Amino acid sequence: EIRFCDWSSDVCSSDLSPRTDWLTDPAEASGYIVLGMGKYGARELNYSSDIDLIVFFDPEKARPTGGLDPSTFFVRITRDLVKLMTERTPEGYVFRTDLRLRPDPGATQIALSVDAALQYYETVGQNWERAAYIKARAVAGDIAAGEAFLRELSPYIWRKYLDYAAIADIHAMKRQIHAHKGHARIAIEGHNLKLGRGGIREIEFFVQTQQLIAGGRQSDLRVPETLTALDRLEARGWISPPTAAEMAEAYPFLRSIEHRLQMLDDEQTHSLPSRPEKFEQIARFSGYENGAALAKAVRQRLETVQTHYAALFEDVPALSRSAAPGSLVFTGDSDDPETVKTLAEMGFSSPSSVIGKIGRAHV
């Protein structure tokens, strides 16, 4: 993994120092907090990954001189930082960067004050946001302030008791995953290893759901890494040794195939090829004699994951076909046309608004 934390601090320093005389070392006790989320936070990045960041600031720690508003200043710094990472040059780019996991991204600035963030999470924070913070870590800027923020947020993430509404919300997250287009069955050619049935997201949700339920009372379950969490869930008796072993074997297997898919054409993809010649190519690249051998290995893992995942939610009703007659996809940078159509058929007058609000649940 690229030493983004050190690099980002250097960028912040070089960007801030020429503009101000109020802070000599912006990477030290500046109150500027950059949290890494998702696979970046858990040190589980793909070969071709976006990185998910949330940026906060503590105005009490860093007060710009000259009457400059702290919010304006830190928004500007964040915008410049993201531009440096995402801008394509002859040498390429550093990372595609996504800031949309912050509180209410459609209505808030890209850098929020710590107080505003805490108030949001304490009053209207959602369970999907609690799940997202399982993998959060301070990665740049004022690391000590970032770690202090996560400690303060800990009671929100790790509740000692879950009420029925919270558990129902977790079940709703599961149903939404199953509503994803292409999730109805296991298909090999064209199967999405991340979002499809038996895929990577099911393993991660299998783990995170049980962490949310038990982590408030058992602090050793509060770990960001998927494989470490599986080990600890087994040790605590939440899952059986065979289940832990099979899920722990399937996760790196599926991730390794995902990496190779992204290496093949240097693009961000999670789906196995539909064309036979491309499938043979990825099979050989993955160390298999032919496509049939790879297909057999992939199907075995997908079916294993599907079995364990379904057992965890065996009493959860499926999303009603009458309520959702078509596709429901809430990921991606643009609205899925089939999802817009489905929501319109369900009676929503503004499908794009609905997609924007629900899309933050996919982390």
Model-identified regions with their sequence ranges:
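A glycine-rich phosphate-binding loop feature that marks nucleotide/adenosyl-phosphate handling sites
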Residues: 17-32, 94-110, 172-175, 194-198, ...
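Single conserved hydrophobic/aromatic residue that forms the stacking wall/gate
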Residues: 1-12, 361
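Conserved catalytic core of two-metal-ion nucleotidyltransferases
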Residues: 12-35, 64-123
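Polyanionic (Asp/Glu-rich) segments that form extended negatively charged tracts
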Residues: 60-62, 125-128, 205, 227, ...
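Catalytic metal-binding acidic patch
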Residues: 33-35, 40-68, 203
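Long, hydrophobic, amphipathic alpha-helical segments used as structural scaffolds
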Residues: 9, 14-17, 85, 89-93, ...
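Core structural elements
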Residues: 31-32, 37-40, 161-236, 248-262, ...
